[in-house]
């Protein structure tokens, strides 16, 4: 488990490229036949990926010990979106087939969660966010047909995109975790611009569906002290509440967003005009 401490905005603005990477960048999300796990002190979110190929993968009791509990989800809820080939997730003996861009919400208290790929030639890639939970909501599969989509932006401003809301109150109940997938229309490059912060929630972006020769310049920092982190395919970035989170790519791309914090009101954000950015 890679533990990331919270960081004050005054400290963050003094960091060089490597310093920003050390604090915010999750460079390697998928490793064959393993799980990756980054634990952030910011709202106690856990972020990672699971890519089973030749064997099943489960999160063992060693993680429970690191969290001070008996097992991983004793006091946590889990959201998973599959960006790879078809796979299965078995939760306490109940098997769910999770296809490409299907998702699974796993409620607090699930003791055994096992991940597998159906075809080793096209393995599943399970990206997950995990957050503290106060009660148990039912485990539920969500397919792309069941999400709450919203299309925003315009081709003229190169920010036309569809926001697919997977884990939001309109789709299912969770304790605090919200997740979704945003896909840019062909030829569009900007996400979340004009940008915003949200004092009451933190957020993690996971960028994928990018060519090897493409990248995204992820904008972060306070609106008057912006910085950037260069993101490559299948990398994630942590965004504290005080930071903007926006990006521009050399080509169109897709990203998964996950939020935890005070509320689940999607529009609870503090907008920042482009003219006010520095």
UniProtKB/Swiss-Prot annotation:
Pathway: Glycan metabolism; pectin degradation; 2-dehydro-3-deoxy-D-gluconate from pectin: step 4/5
UniProt: Zn(2+) binding residues: 196, 198, 203, 245
Record's cofactor remark: Binds 1 zinc ion per subunit.
Cofactor(s) in the UniProt record: Zn(2+)
Keywords: Isomerase, Metal-binding, Zinc
Superkingdom of origin organism: Bacteria
EC numbers: 5.3.1.17
Reactions catalysed, as given in the entry: 5-dehydro-4-deoxy-D-glucuronate = 3-deoxy-D-glycero-2,5-hexodiulosonate
InterPro entries: KduI, KduI/IolB_isomerase, KduI_N, RmlC-like_jellyroll, RmlC_Cupin_sf
Pfam families linked: KduI (PF04962)
Top EC category: isomerase
GO MF assignments: 4-deoxy-L-threo-5-hexosulose-uronate ketol-isomerase activity; zinc ion binding
Gene Ontology BP term (one): pectin catabolic process
Keyword hit for Nucleus: no
Biological role stated in the UniProt entry: Catalyzes the isomerization of 5-dehydro-4-deoxy-D-glucuronate to 3-deoxy-D-glycero-2,5-hexodiulosonate.
Protein family: Belongs to the KduI family.
Protein name: 4-deoxy-L-threo-5-hexosulose-uronate ketol-isomerase
